[in-house]
């Protein structure tokens, strides 16, 4: 059971392939869900520094996965960015 209805829509597409839970897309969706929950938590608890550190770590993991996906398959990267409504990473 998924608590977040937004993520459940994307997870339904991913659940067609049960073996695909380790895919980059599934991991990015999971990290995005955690990021949104932590962000709403930190709006209430501004001085929760351990949660801030956890949020920064998850953001870094998601950023690395998105960089990997953009190098390997640009089309899937663009689709995922569009579905999750995430900004595209800056290029140097």
UniProtKB/Swiss-Prot annotation:
GO biological process entries: translation
Compartments, as annotated in UniProt: Plastid, Chloroplast
Cited SMART domains: Ribosomal_S15 (SM01387)
Coiled coil ranges: none
Origin: domain of life: Eukaryota
Chief site of localization: plastid
Entry-linked PROSITE patterns: RIBOSOMAL_S15 (PS00362)
Alphabetical UniProt keywords: Chloroplast, Plastid, Ribonucleoprotein, Ribosomal protein
A GO CC annotation given for this chain: ribonucleoprotein complex
GO MF entries: structural constituent of ribosome
InterPro entries: Ribosomal_uS15, Ribosomal_uS15_bac-type, uS15_NS1_RNA-bd_sf
Protein family: Belongs to the universal ribosomal protein uS15 family.
Quaternary structure note: Part of the 30S ribosomal subunit.
Listed NCBIfam families: S15_bact
Protein name per Swiss-Prot or TrEMBL: Small ribosomal subunit protein uS15c
Protein source organism: Helianthus annuus
The encoding gene: rps15
């Amino acid at each position: 059971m998924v608590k977040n209805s937004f993520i459940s829509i994307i997870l339904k597409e991913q659940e067609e392939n049960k073996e695909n839970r380790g895919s980059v897309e599934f991991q990015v969706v999971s990290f995005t869900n955690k990021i949104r929950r932590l962000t709403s938590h930190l709006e209430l608890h501004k001085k929760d520094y351990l949660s801030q550190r956890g949020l920064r770590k998850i953001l870094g993991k998601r950023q690395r996965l998105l960089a990997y996906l953009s190098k390997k398959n640009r089309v899937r990267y663009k689709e995922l960015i569009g579905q999750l409504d995430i900004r595209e990473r800056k290029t140097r």
